[in-house]
Amino acid sequence: MTFEPTETLRDPFVLYGESFASRLLLGTARYPSPATLQAAVEASRPAMITVALRRQTAVGSGDGQTLGGETFWQMLRTLGVPVLPNTAGCFTAQEVITTAMMAREVFETDWIKLELIGDDYTLQPDTLNMPAVAETLVKEGFKVLPYCTEDLVLCRRLLDVGCQALMPWAAPIGTGRGAVNPHAMRTLRDRLPDTPLIVDAGLGLPSHAAQVLEWGYDGVLLNTAVAQSAYPVNMARAFALAVEAGRTAYLAGPMPEREVAQASTPVVGMPFWHAEGAEDRA
């Protein structure tokens, strides 16, 4: 059988009933320039690009959005990639809801990445109030993708209020540490086998992305790992390849881990294979 590199495209990434060819989502902040951002998007071909709604449009904001205001949004639209607005910087339920409503009007989409921050030092999500906010957004007709922790109880509660996909972190935002609690993340995947899970925050290397895809996670969202690398365009492409490799490996069915060595070469047919103790030495 001939391997087709595109065979993972027959394994669509489905969110809220919509299929996407890519399992990578890409943030648009903190790039060296708009041109670099545009090239990174073209190199990785993400399923969506995330955008923070600005209440004021300042030129030269220091996060790569130096075109400022409407010009920046027009540039994003020319990329031909669906936009996923987020509620970054919101610390209260009312801020989230207001920002989401404004984003829906500006970007003409019901998609929203829910970010409700509980601590401005760790940027940890407000896990206590998030389910209620998510429920309100769902009732308002939004397709909610909540940024959350790997806490199983929280994730179940978010599903109970109507979220159809979750975005647990691997580590705090911008740390680039990869999965700091592999046991909890793998447990979450095992206990929610039918829920789309997108790892959001904490990934720093393409190998981190490949790892969580190998565990069965459905996708990853990246920003700092690409935007703050030495060569963002190359890193964007590297992450896209890692995501495809990780998903392909998961579908291939990795071998089980073992505590002891097991010979990969059979001893039958080898010189002295029938001698006493040969199998023990193999």
Curated annotation (Swiss-Prot):
CDD domains attached to this UniProt entry: ThiG (cd04728)
Location of this chain's protein in the cell: Cytoplasm
Swiss-Prot/TrEMBL catalytic activity: [ThiS sulfur-carrier protein]-C-terminal-Gly-aminoethanethioate + 2-iminoacetate + 1-deoxy-D-xylulose 5-phosphate = [ThiS sulfur-carrier protein]-C-terminal Gly-Gly + 2-[(2R,5Z)-2-carboxy-4-methylthiazol-5(2H)-ylidene]ethyl phosphate + 2 H2O + H(+)
Function of the molecule: Catalyzes the rearrangement of 1-deoxy-D-xylulose 5-phosphate (DXP) to produce the thiazole phosphate moiety of thiamine. Sulfur is provided by the thiocarboxylate moiety of the carrier protein ThiS. In vitro, sulfur can be provided by H(2)S.
Protein name, entry field: Thiazole synthase
Gene Ontology CC entries for this record: cytoplasm
Any Pfam family the entry gives: ThiG
E.C. number(s) listed in UniProt: 2.8.1.10
Subunit architecture: Homotetramer. Forms heterodimers with either ThiH or ThiS.
Record-annotated active site: 113
Example of a GO biological process term: thiamine diphosphate biosynthetic process
Family that this chain belongs to: Belongs to the ThiG family.
UniProt key word Ribosomal protein: no
Highest taxon in the source lineage: Bacteria
Binding site for 1-deoxy-D-xylulose 5-phosphate: 174, 201-202, 223-224
Organism name: Cupriavidus metallidurans (strain ATCC 43123 / DSM 2839 / NBRC 102507 / CH34) (Ralstonia metallidurans)
Entry keyword Cytoplasm: yes
Pathway(s) this gene product operates in, as recorded in its UniProt entry: Cofactor biosynthesis; thiamine diphosphate biosynthesis
An annotated Gene Ontology molecular function: thiazole synthase activity
Alphabetically ordered keywords of this record: Cytoplasm, Schiff base, Thiamine biosynthesis, Transferase
Gene (name only): thiG
